[in-house]
UniProtKB/Swiss-Prot annotation:
Effect on the protein of changing residue 1315 to R: In Sprague-Dawley males; could be unrelated to gender
InterPro entries membership: 2Fe-2S-bd (IPR002888), 2Fe-2S-bd_dom_sf (IPR036884), 2Fe-2S_ferredoxin-like_sf (IPR036010), 2Fe-2S_ferredoxin-type (IPR001041), 2Fe2S_fd_BS (IPR006058), Ald_Oxase/Xan_DH_a/b (IPR000674), Ald_Oxase/Xan_DH_a/b_sf (IPR036856), Ald_Oxase/xanthine_DH-like (IPR016208)
A GO CC term attached to the entry: cytosol
Organism, as annotated: Rattus norvegicus
Domain FAD-binding PCMH-type: 235-420
Record note on cofactor: Binds 2 [2Fe-2S] clusters per subunit.
Family the entry assigns: Belongs to the xanthine dehydrogenase family.
Protein name: Aldehyde oxidase 1
Superkingdom in the source lineage: Eukaryota
EC number assigned by the record: 1.2.3.1, 1.17.3.-
PROSITE patterns: 2FE2S_FER_1, 2FE2S_FER_2, FAD_PCMH, MOLYBDOPTERIN_EUK
Additional free-text comment from the UniProt record: Male and female rats possess kinetically distinct forms which may be due to differences in redox states. AOX genes evolved from a xanthine oxidoreductase ancestral precursor via a series of gene duplication and suppression/deletion events. Different animal species contain a different complement of AOX genes encoding an equivalent number of AOX isoenzymes. In mammals, the two extremes are represented by certain rodents such as mice and rats, which are endowed with 4 AOX genes, and by humans, whose genome is characterized by a single active gene.
Chain positions recorded as [2Fe-2S] cluster 2 binding sites: 113, 116, 148, 150
Positions that bind FAD: 263-270, 344, 353, 357, 366, 410
Length: 1333
């Protein structure tokens, strides 16, 4: 029998597939089969949104079309029969017309690296197809499933807000004041100074949204749905069979025939299990358009919903129902809605089904606890007939008597209405407020006897605290008949803690936090019910006090908004001079249309091979044997490369290409599998058998490294003044320490490379996503034993880097190049997200120990600090990180007597490397923690102590570099004024006095960020500029475009210097073929150094062409170029900048390592929930000295994006390792970077007026890194709020600071009667699931 055809449409074009592989997902099909590369691979698990596309389905029963976003990485193509798929390429392009979403995303400066942009565009596009004038709530909800690492989200919101009603207005729903004009407490915003800045974009330029111009749903698909008789479709391959029944009878028959086969609707549960856990299902049953699975039946008793309805459809249905029915009947519906608003992202909610969510019974399911306490029932069907079972705790535990039978199908779910005197509540706490699995969640229900406040029924279930949803049935039974009072609450907490238990080594860790949440949620429920009883019987039940009422309010954001104050262009500047103007990122349009080409978007090369790595599963072990035989026998496998193949080219410094006889970390490269397809290479890698023998010692933490004296080199040290003598005169001395956790780069584009042998003279071309093409060129040449001039490295753009695409990228490129050279064929290597996070180290975990002497007035007179960074298993950049940390640790403060020492620790973790800020975010936090503790001891505010100790005039740093701190202090004063510090600090105190369970905090942090690379050689740069006879110019330089807009700025430089329109200047990318011997792009100096080289090349050309131009001053560049050609005058010039004068002598502890300093200050105000540890950034004000901004739009983007990345570092980004050194957090489901829900509700960014710096490019300053540190203003604002909570509870003295300040750490620091109730495990009595490193 011939297999059925798969018929669907993509971007209006018909697609027919006769031989469908059921294991094929839509993402690789679009990218490889249809060459639609605008849809990106970001994580492969539906967690980042980079692969978002829109699916449209026609319903012949309702004659309606449903448009919804999905994650293409989790969408099997077999599920697409009869659908229309729209990708970013299908809505607009540069060749025809742009869609308004694409235009506005680009012109509102909403792209940086651009890798996430197509996903953002498609999420917004899908929203507009359903809601042409969305509300702000709908907008933020639609983008909740999309991650961006570069922008900080604010410009994305700005772009999308232009489609909202009244451009995002809330219609005065909040305090009667427009959301766009709100300031503090609804007053008119930001009145101080009222400086005006030119708009970064003009809405008048935007084309209007015209829904009539969208792609129509294919009429053919409508006809098929209307007229074609329904028939089960079966798609199969050698490994898998996909069955798509189209009637309920066929579905029941298929389930009877294949009882072990899972029924999937959205593939959001089965898909990740298949991809990440290696689960394989030979048969999958996927119902398609079965009406009975989508029923909506509302009666007086409740609601019956089809099991096939998507979670987003359920959300819409419940939203409609709660608006129509009395509140007392909709308790369960409202609780479900509360969780549906934060459950996953819009894409997953549109894919996942209600039935799938229930039957999967995941331990952290948000809906199942609520459905269970709500007495829901499940309607089942099999060949034996219909059956109804309760959705009970026994069902969730998969007890045989209460479970589905293998042949049964879940058809629908009955959700009863709540009754009078019945209350249902939902609770959850996650690492991030939205699109994050719950750490603990709960559903709770109570029914009282009529009017008496005496418990008649009680049901409490928890998720996240066991292998499945766990109930407190016995506790509830014992509480029946008890009155609803504090005595009952106290008893309930103790009973529940005794019944719902967690072992100290429970999977997921956070055991004490989870125990605390169990009873914190119970307390919240107690208060919510009291509030409900008050509504039902106001005369009998008193109102909650303000102190208690604060426990009930969730930390929801208001609508996001911002103000920007940047620099005006001088009125004397020529209109055509682009310097200082907010020019759009020149790849912005291509980002938004999907036309921007990244490394893995490059077309396949003839006979291309694919490489994947086998990595170590042990942290410190001897390799006993490697068995390749089984893997080599698999079809399509071409070769497996080990260290033996590389001969003597195995080690570069402390970095090893492939492990030889030992492995030193989990994730170390052991061998590389080469096959004719990516799938076959990955399958074969699983069959490589490596036998290990563990070695001692296993060193994972800094403390263990100190114990074993495991350091890479001897200490680095800087000292000024006489520290020991100064301690003798100090009024007080304190000692403390702070641990700062690591951070994953989480660039959206994973490590990617394509190596192409040229077939002549051993030449080889490397197309790679890197910051340092020269380094790759050198290592590949050494590995292949070629001269460097035969190895060329090309980089068009990089989808984010942040320091993470240097060292390990070069290692992987060398191995890939070896494979390509050996086989004479192109080899492609692209890491999956989990591989990338496992192999490549991130920011260094850090430990700072300080001893500080100070006077009673807050003056710090002596400081002795030890810095330790966890370098991992090889040196990489660790020594430089420690050196930069020591050089920059003073931040904004003059410490007259200072000793700082640092060590890079060797451990058995993947080598940590550079990450935006390069040691300063850690070292600066150590200093600020010390200053904060001094303030507490002195009874002063931290801001007072900061002001007292700050550099203020011309001064010397602790390494004897002179600088002027006038601008630093100006930033500080300006920030204190603009943020209305005094008034708001008073308001925070008033709020805290009135609220026991919510607390607010404020912190203002200064910034002095040194910019420089430490030596002249590392700061040199070159450029090449050609002028063609048509008057156009081509510029090449050594910098890498990775989102910061360096190419845009270089074209601005050429335009100014040559007085040539920017439209006449082009830049193709970066290549060692055009500009050799480049330095790495990083350290905030890429535009500085390369811009000066480009400027030099332009000035060389102008000097050369000056006689020609002076003879024809009214001519055009076309005229001048032709004349130059006729006169044999070269139209090409090399520009060169030798580097800033930089030096540091570590033996003497002095030097001039930095060219200039970036100054700034940030004030953040936060609110915390003392019962859950949740926090919300209410407002952030940032003031920056940027010199003279070359492009304010790009510079604001750098400051804002860096701040949000820093905020993530200090609050929610938490790496988790096992005690054996295995990284648990290998993707966005386990590792949380900030999402839209995390950004400040208000954000105000101000640039100081231009200041002159003669040595830099047009007096500009590099801003790529400095803003990261300002994110710690949120950290210290949280600290301030926690301290207020502790003071109110009578807890004095400091508490141990660690970063990040996650919900767990915040909650456990807010000690109260609930934290005292929980059982504690004795240290050493158990093996923890995870450890801090």
């Amino acid at each position: 029998m011939d297999p059925p055809q798969l018929l669907f449409y993509v971007n209006g074009q018909k697609v027919v597939e006769n031989n469908v592989d059921p294991e094929m997902m839509l993402l690789p099909y679009l990218r490889k089969n249809l060459r639609l590369t605008g849809t990106k691979y970001g994580c492969g698990g539906g967690g980042c949104g980079a692969c978002t596309v829109m699916i449209s389905r026609y319903n012949p029963s309702t004659k309606s079309i449903r448009h919804h976003p999905v994650n293409a990485c989790l969408t099997p193509i077999c599920s697409l029969y009869g659908t229309a798929v729209t990708t970013v390429e299908g809505i607009g392009n540069t060749r025809t017309r742009l869609h308004p979403v694409q235009e506005r995303i680009a012109k509102c400066h909403s792209t940086q690296c651009g890798f996430c942009t197509p996903g953002m565009v498609m999420s917004m596009y899908a929203l507009l197809r359903n809601h042409p004038e969305p509300s702000l709530d709908q907008l933020t909800d639609a983008l909740g499933g999309n991650l961006c690492r570069c922008t900080g989200y604010r410009p994305i919101i700005d772009a999308c807000k232009t489609f909202c009603r009244a451009s995002g207005c809330c219609e005065s729903k909040e305090n009667g004041v427009c959301c766009l004009d709100q300031g503090i407490n609804g007053s008119a915003e930001f009145q101080e100074g009222d400086e005006t800045s030119p708009e970064l974009f003009s809405e008048k330029e935007f084309q209007p949204l015209d829904p009539t111009q969208e792609l129509i749903f294919p009429p053919e698909l409508m006809r098929i749905a209307e007229k074609q008789p329904p028939k089960t479709r079966v798609f199969y391959s050698n490994r898998m069979t996909w069955i798509s029944p189209v009637t309920l009878e066929e579905l029941v028959e298929a389930k009877f025939k294949y009882p072990g086969a899972p029924i999937v609707m959205g593939y959001t549960s089965v898909g990740p299990e298949v991809k990440f856990k290696g689960v394989f299902h030979p048969i999958i049953i996927s119902p398609d358009r079965i009406e009975e699975l989508s029923i909506i039946n509302q009666t007086g008793d409740g609601l019956t919903l089809g099991a096939g309805l998507s979670l987003d459809q359920v959300k819409d249905i419940l939203t409609d129902v709660v608006q129509k029915l009395p509140e007392e009947t909709t308790q369960t519906y409202r609780a479900l809605l509360k969780h549906l608003r934060t459950l996953a992202g819009s894409q997953i909610r549109n894919m996942a089904s209600l039935g799938g969510h229930i039957v999967s019974r995941h331990l952290d399911s948000d809906l199942n606890p609520l459905l269970a306490v709500g007495n829901c029932t499940l309607n089942l069907l099999s060949k034996d007939g219909k059956r109804q079972i309760p959705l009970s705790e026994q069902f969730l535990r998969k007890c045989p008597d209460s479970d589905l039978k293998p042949q049964e199908v879940l058809v629908s779910v009955n959700i009863p209405c709540s009754r009078k005197w019945e209350f249902v509540s939902a609770f959850r706490q996650a690492q991030r407020q939205q699109n994050a699995l719950a750490i603990v969640n709960s559903g709770m229900r109570v029914l009282f006897r009529e009017g008496g406040g005496v418990i008649k029924e009680l049901s409490i279930l928890y998720g996240g605290v066991g292998p499945t949803t766990i109930g407190a049935k016995n506790s509830c039974q014992k509480l029946i008949g008890r009155p609803w009072n504090e005595e009952m609450l106290d008893t309930a907490c103790r009973l529940v803690l005794d019944e719902v238990t967690l072992a100290g080594s429970a999977p997921g860790g956070k055991v004490e936090f989870k125990r605390t949440l169990i009873i914190s949620f119970l307390f919240k429920f107690y208060l919510e019910v009291l509030q409900g009883l008050k509504r039902e019987d106001p005369g009998h039940y008193p109102s909650l006090t303000n102190n208690y009422e604060s426990a009930l309010e969730d930390l929801h954001s208001k609508h996001h908004w911002r103000t920007l104050t940047h620099q005006n262009v001088d009125s004397m500047q020529l209109p055509q001079d682009p310097i200082g103007r907010p020019i759009m990122h020149l790849s912005g349009i291509k980002h938004a249309t999907g036309e921007a080409i990244y490394c893995d978007d490059m077309p396949a090369v003839d006979r291309e091979l694919f490489l994947t790595f086998v990595t170590s599963s042990r942290a410190h072990a001897k390799i006993v044997s490697i068995d390749l035989s089984e893997a080599l026998s698999l079809p399509g496998v071409v070769d497996i490369i080990t260290a033996d193949h590389l001969q003597d080219a195995t080690t570069f410094g402390t970095e090893t290409l492939l492990a030889t006889d030992k492995v030193h970390c989990v994730g170390q490269l052991v061998c590389a599998v080469i096959a004719d397809s990516e799938t076959r290479a990955k399958q074969a890698a699983k069959h490589v058998k490596v036998v290990y023998r563990d070695l001692e010692p296993l060193i994972l933490t800094i403390e263990e490294a100190i114990q074993h004296k495991s350091f890479f080199e001897s200490e680095r040290k800087l000292e000024c003044g006489n520290v020991d003598e100064a301690f003798k005169i100090a009024d007080q001395i304190l000692e403390g320490e702070i641990h700062i956790g690591g951070q994953e780069h989480f660039y959206m584009e994973t490590q990617s490379m394509l190596v192409v042998p040229k077939g002549e003279d051993g030449e080889i071309d490397i197309y790679v996503s890197t910051q340092f093409p020269k380094h790759i060129q050198d290592i590949v040449a050494a590995t292949l034993k070629l001269s460097v001039n035969k190895v060329m490295c090309h980089v068009r753009r990089v989808g984010g880097a942040f320091g993470g695409k240097v060292g390990k990228t070069s290692i992987m490129a060398a191995i890939t190049a070896f494979a390509a050279s050996k086989h004479g064929r192109a080899v492609r290597c692209t890491l999956e997200r989990g591989e990338d996070m496992l192999i490549t180290g991130g920011r260094h975990p850090y430990l700072g120990k300080y001893k500080v002497g100070f006077m009673r007035d807050g003056r710090i007179v002596a400081l002795d600090v030890e810095h330790y960074c966890n370098g991992g298993s090889s040196l990489d950049e660790s020594l430089w990180v420690i050196e930069m940390g020591l050089l920059k640790m003073d931040n904004a403060y003059k410490f007259p007597n200072l000793r700082c020492r640092g060590w890079a620790c060797r451990t058995n973790l993947p080598s940590h490397t550079a990450l935006r800020g390069f040691g300063f975010p850690q070292a600066g936090l150590v200093t600020e923690a010390c200053v904060t503790e001094v303030a507490i001891r002195c009874g002063l505010s931290p801001e007072q102590v900061r002001t007292i100790n700050m550099y203020k005039q011309i001064d010397n740093t602790h390494y004897k570099q002179e600088f002027s701190a006038k601008t630093l202090f100006e930033c500080w004063r300006e920030c204190m004024a603009k943020c209305s510090y005094s008034e708001r600090k008073t308001a925070v105190g008033k709020f805290n006095a009135e609220n026991s369970w919510k607390k607010r905090g404020m912190a203002v942090i200064p910034l002095k960020f040194p910019v420089g690379v430490g030596s002249v050689a590392m700061g040199q740069a070159a450029a090449l500029v050609h002028i063609y006879l048509d008057g156009s110019a081509l510029v090449s330089h050594g910098g890498i475009e990775m989102g910061q807009g360096v190419h845009t700025k270089m074209i601005q430089v050429v335009s100014r210097e040559l007085k040539m329109p920017m439209s006449s200047v082009h830049l193709r990318g970066t290549s060692t073929e055009t500009v050799p011997n480049t330095n790495a792009s990083g350290g905030s100096v890429v535009a500085d150094l390369n811009g000066l080289a480009v400027k030099d090349a332009c000035q060389t050309l102008l000097k050369r062409l000056e006689p020609i131009i002076s003879k024809n001053p009214q001519g055009t560049w076309k005229d001048w170029a032709q004349t130059a050609f006729d006169q044999s005058v070269s139209l090409s010039a090399v520009g060169y900048f030798r580097g800033y004068e930089s030096n540091i002598n570590w033996e003497k502890g002095e030097g001039h390592p930095f060219e200039y300093f970036v100054y700034g200050a940030a004030c953040s105000e936060v609110e915390i929930d003392c019962l859950t540890g949740d926090h919300k950034n209410i407002r952030t004000d940032i003031v920056m000295d940027v010199g003279h901004s070359i492009n304010p739009a790009l510079d604001i983007g750098q400051v804002e994006g860096a701040f949000i990345q820093g905020m993530g570092l200090y609050t929610i980004e938490e790496l988790s390792y096992s005690p054996q050194g295995i990284l648990y957090s290998r993707g966005p489901n386990q590792y949380k970077i900030p999402a839209i829900c995390d950004i400040p509700t208000e954000m105000h960014i101000s640039f100081l007026p231009p200041s002159e710096h003669s040595n830099t490019l047009y007096s500009s300053k590099g801003l790529g890194e400095s803003g990261v540190f300002l994110g710690c203003s949120v950290f210290f604002a949280i600290h301030d709020a926690v301290r207020a909570a502790r003071q109110e509870r009578g807890i004095s003295g400091p508490w141990k600071l660690t970063s990040p300040l996650t919900p767990e750490k915040i909650r456990m620091a807010c000690e109260d009667k609930f934290t005292k109730m929980i059982p504690r495990d004795e240290p050493g009595s158990y093996v923890p699931w995870n450890i801090p490193v």
